[in-house]
Amino acid sequence: MRTLKSLVILLAFGCYVPLVLADDASVIISSPADGAKLGRTAQTKINYEVMPGSKGDHTHLYVDDKEVAVLRQLKGSHTLESLAPGKHEICIKIVSKGHTPIGVQQCIKVSVEDQNDY
């Protein structure tokens, strides 16, 4: 009887784990790196990969808390026009179909320097 009970518990747990893992949402910004120094005239290419989970639908790209793009591909890139000199925060947030952030995001900080600073 004890073996049967253990088997039932193990089977129930084994069925539950894939459901939990399927709900995991994540965002990875692969470039530029956090803390990168960028030239002022250069366009910035953001490379990313997203797992939206069950609550997410697509992603929004933000620069300094301002939405600059809607990203519908789970893996890809987006090119930003040149940024003003100074420090900037770039974030990708997973949002629902209603465009509400679900709380999963990744942010990086970059510094844009004048060409004379090189």
Per-region residue spans from a language model:
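Short beta-strand segments within Ig-like beta-sandwich modules, predominantly Fibronectin type-III
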Residues: E67-L74
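Beta-strand signatures of extracellular beta-sandwich domains
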Residues: H58-Y62
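Short acidic/polar inter-strand loop motif in beta-rich domains
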Residues: A69, V95-G103
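Short coil/turn motif common to extracellular beta-sandwich-like domains
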Residues: L38-N47
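Short, flexible loop/turn segments at beta-strand junctions in immunoglobulin-like
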Residues: L80-P85
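Short, compositionally biased P/S/T/A/G/V-rich stretches that sit at domain boundaries
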Residues: A22-G39, D117-Y118
